Amino acid sequence: MELSDSDRPVSFGSTSSSASSRDSHGSFGSRMTLVSNSHMGLFNQDKEVGAIKLELIPARPFSSSELQRDNPATGQQNADEGSERPPRAQWRVDSNGAPKTIADSATSPKLLYVDRVVQEILETERTYVQDLKSIVEDYLDCIRDQTKLPLGTEERSALFGNIQDIYHFNSELLQDLENCENDPVAIAECFVSKSEEFHIYTQYCTNYPRSVAVLTECMRNKILAKFFRERQETLKHSLPLGSYLLKPVQRILKYHLLLHEIENHLDKDTEGYDVVLDAIDTMQRVAWHINDMKRKHEHAVRLQEIQSLLTNWKGPDLTSYGELVLEGTFRIQRAKNERTLFLFDKLLLITKKRDDTFTYKAHILCGNLMLVEVIPKEPLSFSVFHYKNPKLQHTVQAKSQQDKRLWVLHLKRLILENHAAKIPAKAKQAILEMDAIHHPGFCYSPEGGTKALFGSKEGSAPYRLRRKSEPSSRSHKVLKTSETAQDIQKVSREEGSPQLSSARPSPAQRNSQPSSSTMISVLRAGGALRNIWTDHQIRQALFPSRRSPQENEDDEDDYQMFVPSFSSSDLNSTRLCEDSTSSRPCSWHMGQMESTETSSSGHRIVRRASSAGESNTCPPEIGTSDRTRELQNSPKTEGQEEMTPFGSSIELTIDDIDHVYDNISYEDLKLMVAKREEAESTPSKSARDSVRPKSTPELAFTKRQAGHSKGSLYAQTDGTLSGGEASSQSTHELQAVEENIYDTIGLPDPPSLGFKCSSLKRAKRSTFLGLEADFVCCDSLRPFVSQDSLQLSEDEAPYHQATPDHGYLSLLYDSPSGNLSMPHKPVSDKLSEEVDEIWNDLENYIKKNEDKARDRLLAAFPVSKDDVPDRLHAESTPELSRDVGRSVSTLSLPESQALLTPVKSRAGRASRANCPFEEDLISKEGSFMSLNRLSLASEMPLMDNPYDLANSGLSQTDPENPDLGMEATDKTKSRVFMMARQYSQKIKKANQLLKVKSLELEQPPASQHQKSMHKDLAAILEEKKQGGPAIGARIAEYSQLYDQIVFRESPLKIQKDGWASPQESSLLRSVSPSQVHHGSGDWLLHSTYSNGELADFCLPPEQDLRSRYPTFEINTKSTPRQLSAACSVPSLQTSDPLPGSVQRCSVVVSQPNKENWCQDHLYNSLGRKGISAKSQPYHRSQSSSSVLINKSMDSINYPSDVGKQQLLSLHRSSRCESHQDLLPDIADSHQQGTEKLSDLTLQDSQKVVVVNRNLPLNAQIATQNYFSNFKETDGDEDDYVEIKSEEDESELELSHNRRRKSDSKFVDADFSDNVCSGNTLHSLNSPRTPKKPVNSKLGLSPYLTPYNDSDKLNDYLWRGPSPNQQNIVQSLREKFQCLSSSSFA
């Protein structure tokens, strides 16, 4: 006879489930009582915290004879008598290993308790095996015998699984346990020896949900339900079959708990104690594995259910996106109804629940997913969006902080796991473990995945959590950062989970390499350490380049992305840096604060930190000195242990977690600065590109093309970049049309070509410092660059008295807040002085700048230099200009054609006499700093390999100041600050776009007739939106909107003869940073503003123009084909070109894409050989408000080679005239050609703008010219934009066609006259002949004039759409659609 359920001992540690308590009897039985320990002679000494008390015994103690099932009568009789079971001679092992009986150890309650635990294991195992036998023999075999039951073989297999295998295995295990004679060490050895065989439980547990489903179906069948009820009554089971089928699942998850009880009460000195620990590890791993497999199975079932309920989904089967990780219902901003989010391994699916179905709304692949964790004033919200479309953000409001943290943690894990870059597993683990420190409930386990700890023994979790199991007996320790790394590493080794704990790890964890432990210790040991995901700025620094899959990068370089950039000398054994040839900015921000001294710049560099990230701009000398101090200040360790990089002894406890979601604080800034100072590259490290932070919450994805073997200083990068930042990293995968996120102007990473110091030229530079210097020095950017960012405070020293050695870097970091602090001021003082300003609301920042009248000008408003305030010149000192001259040639040479916007260096105007030059070929009179770029470029032969080119550029870096050393790099600051300044520039740009108001206050009486000034559409709409959404939303909306609306072109400017004076070195300002650039179409292509305006070209006086032309408007009747890739103003980056894209010619037309004749010729004129790349139409609307000619080639029909020859002639003549301007002795020889060339036109009203020498116009005439883009009205119709009818242009076609023939006749002859008289170019008639002109370095003409007399007022009118051009109505509709779609709020 079988034991009834009430007669078997059940462990208090066993888990009950709803299935096992469905009947009236609980899992303990209806007659069970809990016997106190005191009844067993046990007192308080064993009542330790956390111990599982196993003193559950039957209400009637039964004798051992009851277990003799072969004598049921005797067993029943003994049970009725209630006789006590005689104690067996139980052999114990004392601390000395000598066996003693239980009688001898009666005085040892500890041993008695261990003995009770051993008895518990044996008794419950017997009962468990008995239950298994009942399932197999009394249910499974009986069903097999009953052929009439409507239960097929498949259903039977699903119902019982591999229960027979488990029964046989546990029968053997029970036999082995009984042979151990109650020796706890021997019992533990049994589990270790059979560890491999426990895998059969995985199959059973995975099948269990299906078993429950089959059983449920069976109970709906009357025949089967009756059969199961009868079997239960026959067997006198108090529990139904379902409860018995659950027992294997419960049992396998309980073994490690029982073994824990042995370990907790076994003497640590006992021989074989380690075996018990191994047994615990073994059974824990089994339990984890089973839980994970069971969870995956449950999620697969749920996934299929979701798939069946999902409507409107056009994508592939959801199973292709991996396992379901989380699901939940949230409120979404701007959505009336709640949304149900499903997070898969590779996909975030956003749906709307309707009745029982889910309607698809949106999805984002985890590889493209961006997460904004901190949203101001919304502590429960977070945002997710596609990195290519940051304006379409899904702001999700969680129901609790716990819910938010759960989602955020899993999102971050999946972002890391799905990132295109090769992120080492240890780096991922370190990042997630770092997060786990701040979230006690979550851990990252080596098995890969964030685990949720909810304390339940089965790893159960709330429903929405797709749980991953982890042992629950984990407790935190306080970790002091003053501990040596050895202690930290020992702590790390003793962890069973990523959390700091006192428990032992699994063998796999104990065997983890030191690099993992040291990295973990480094990550953990920061007192002021914060959540690396605190807000999106910090998170951005974590993500390296998104690489094209075909690129093969060095693993060590990838590894650098995610590890703190310690010197390899510090990590010689742990190998955090596999190779010291590359250093990446630290992915998280912490570092040793130097209490003794600071090596940061003496300026007050407090900037609006729009994004996080360090700039490894210090030379190796500084990094070495910092590391030397670090070694001196840090506790010394022995052997292979890593030096702890933290000198403070701040404690990190779980209490520090409470505010991890706050915004980055003052301490974080200090840590970032210190980290940047510490994380310097060694001299051999190449200036590879680095993680680019963003001012928008997006990642900068870089495609790095340079290899370690090249030691290349060149990195071709293009694509998404931060708004207002003058540096960009992206990949060719971002060439899609949708890449116009905020700015798609890409800038190459800077080779250190202009560094005058050998140490600096070796330093890794992660920001575009060269262009940064131009930023500081520019005045043409003044309308859209923050005054606080660019101007030196007038109440302080007018100059920056920097030596030539550090002038360059001090230039880069001149204080954006207009203050220069003294070099001796500590970092903390400088930071604290304006840390509030850094984090002030954007509104206050913008209001502060609104008062400046000049700020209301649009970014590319054409004003001659006569109108520039004089104080700009006073601020530019000889040393400043000298440093700029050194820095202007630090720009990299992009490989493909790209358009770089120019930077007009206001410092260059201060004194041309002080401009340093890298070539002696430039005459004294023509010496302008910007020629450094040209001279550097034209001296270098154009190499097919951009890396060789960069290397040759490196070889040209002048070692004349080799001792720049520490002082120079003391001027460097964290890239956080540089990003802040650029963010302020983006804000300023948006300010202009939003705040363009009537300029009549700045108009003298002569222009009173222009009272009704016209604004662009962005400004018009903004005035209607005043008081609308937050400035951040307006910035997001208008930064792109401004560029996507295509206006009629603004007039060009013509410079006067006196341009060469020190106060007016316009040549400098008209040179683009990419003048060296070997892939672009022409030297003249770069002479444009960032929004496409010709850089230095002023219109002649209005009277002169009116006498010559009825109108001087440039007609661009065709709008660009695509407005989707608009470039915003202040980014100053080269656009990511479509393959071989045709760049916009500011002076001529878009270069033909049929052949590469144009660029070949252009390189020939510079003495270089061209790159034979087929040009493709460049459909991007590059700052459309001032695009001269941006037609794709299909709208430019070259009827014959004559048209091409005209273009060639124009290029040559323009260059010739520019040379004549540069050389006074031939300054007058080009006059004759100007008049003729001005008549040259091309098909489709594509006007060739040619050189002319006229006086610049002042601000008022420039204003009139600019606003003549819009039809003047005499009322208050500022919002009115006229659309001309198609008939208005019909007459113009005839006149243009008539002019075409006569234009082409004299162009070449006139050009040859210019060439001969100028003596500057040699035999350029053949576009393929690579002749090097004498003054090729000087070939730059800042003078353009509008086209000729024959272009009448009618040219200003809109033309009817040609067959391959869009209708103007469609064009306007696109603009307004773009307007409405870009609205964030």
Curated annotation (Swiss-Prot):
Residues 1-31, 63-101, 455-518, 570-646, 677-696, 701-732, 868-887, 1318-1343 are annotated as: Disordered. Residues 317-416 form the PH domain. Keywords: Guanine-nucleotide releasing factor, Phosphoprotein. GO terms for molecular function: guanyl-nucleotide exchange factor activity; small GTPase binding. Residues 868-885 have a biased composition (Basic and acidic residues). GO terms for cellular component: cytosol; nucleoplasm. InterPro entries: DBL_dom_sf, DH_dom, PH-like_dom_sf, PH_domain, PH_PLEKHG1_G2_G3, SOS1_NGEF_PH. Residues 11-30 have a biased composition (Low complexity). Residues 113-293 form the DH domain. The keyword Manganese does not apply. This is Pleckstrin homology domain-containing family G member 1. The modification Phosphoserine is found at residue 1192. Residues 63-80, 498-518, 570-585, 593-602, 714-732, 1318-1328 have a biased composition (Polar residues). It comes from the Eukaryota. GO terms for biological process: regulation of small GTPase mediated signal transduction. The keyword Acetylation does not apply.
